[in-house]
From Swiss-Prot:
Entries under Pfam families matching the protein: Ribosomal_L28 (PF00830)
Family: Belongs to the bacterial ribosomal protein bL28 family.
Gene3D superfamilies: Ribosomal protein L28/L24 (2.30.170.40)
Species lineage: Bacteria, Pseudomonadati, Pseudomonadota, Alphaproteobacteria, Hyphomicrobiales
Molecular function as annotated in GO: structural constituent of ribosome
Keyword Oxidoreductase attached: no
Name of the protein: Large ribosomal subunit protein bL28
Length: 97
């Protein structure tokens, strides 16, 4: 399992610990990932995703998983999330027609 958010694409970042004497040692900044179950209202189904805490706040801000995925850029999404987005857009188009 990779250390990457499935919705925002946040991954591990690298930097330095810097001491008072200005000694630098390499370190990793890990994303705050949570395993969550999100429900798609359009598809009437729940999905288990590994997302960052900030992405979870963004999902709630945009009114749920469907609203977030429709507005999200495909480059940031994981392959699973892109597939889910296509299904949601297709189902919304069917309901509108």
């Amino acid at each position: 399992m990779s250390r990457a958010c499935e919705l925002t694409g946040k991954t591990v970042q690298y930097g330095n610990n810097v001491s008072h004497a200005n000694n630098k040692t390499r370190r990793r900044f890990l994303p705050n990932l949570c395993n969550v179950t999100l429900i798609s209202e359009v598809l009437q189904q729940s999905y288990r995703l590994r997302v960052s805490a900030s992405a979870l706040r963004s999902v709630e801000h945009r009114g749920g998983l469907d609203g977030f995925l429709v507005k999200a850029d495909d480059k940031e999404l994981s392959q699973r999330a892109r597939l889910l987005k296509r299904q949601i857009v297709k189902k919304k188009a069917e309901k509108a027609a």
